[in-house]
């Protein structure tokens, strides 16, 4: 028989990216600002257990070989914190709200900030941790969440550091490692 090669990746090495989109139904009573607060730091840092990894860099202005290995295949492609786009000016938190059910009860959280995973365990952790975080936010909208000063910069900082020792700035003026953010959540 003929040899067949199957690739599961999230970027083509030429500046194009595609990923695994997730969708969550969230109680419409939870203000969208609270949804953003609940998930922003999580989406930036969950790559420590759910990133697919890749060799090289595709961040505009950086040489491909400037990063030998990174945690997430998609991190180099995010340019905005929040927005509607999915193919240009990609946001960490997408605002597309098409719940395909009763829109007076639920909103759709359309997630594009995630890698397609080969590992079933990574997929489980990615989806389950996000679902639990959203459920906690619905139960306690006043719950304190870690807030990053520059999430767009932080998502690439975290990805470009497979040692998990890089620190990112918080909104409060301190610094924290990605793994510490996940422990806080």
Where do the protein language model's features map onto the residues?
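Loop-rich catalytic cores of soluble enzymes, especially ATP-dependent carboxylate-amine ligases
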Residues: 5-7, 11-13, 18-179
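Long, low-complexity C-terminal extensions of enzymes
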Residues: 184-185
């Amino acid at each position: 028989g003929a040899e067949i090669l199957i690739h599961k990746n999230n970027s083509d090495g030429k500046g194009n990216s595609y990923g695994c989109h997730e969708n969550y139904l969230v109680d419409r009573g939870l203000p969208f600002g609270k949804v953003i607060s609940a998930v922003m730091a999580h989406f930036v840092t969950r790559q420590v257990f759910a990133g697919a990894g890749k060799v090289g860099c595709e961040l505009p202005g950086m040489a491909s070989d400037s990063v030998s290995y990174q945690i997430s295949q998609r991190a180099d492609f995010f340019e905005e914190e929040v927005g509607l786009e999915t193919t240009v000016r990609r946001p960490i938190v997408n605002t597309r709200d098409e719940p395909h059910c009763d829109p007076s009860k639920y909103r759709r959280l359309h997630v594009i900030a995630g890698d397609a995973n080969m590992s079933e365990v990574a997929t489980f952790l990615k989806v389950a941790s996000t679902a639990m975080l959203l459920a906690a936010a619905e139960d306690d909208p006043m719950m304190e969440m870690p807030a990053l000063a520059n999430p767009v910069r932080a998502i690439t900082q975290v990805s470009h550091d497979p040692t998990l020792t890089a620190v990112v700035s918080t909104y409060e003026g301190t610094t924290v490692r990605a793994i510490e953010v996940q422990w806080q959540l």
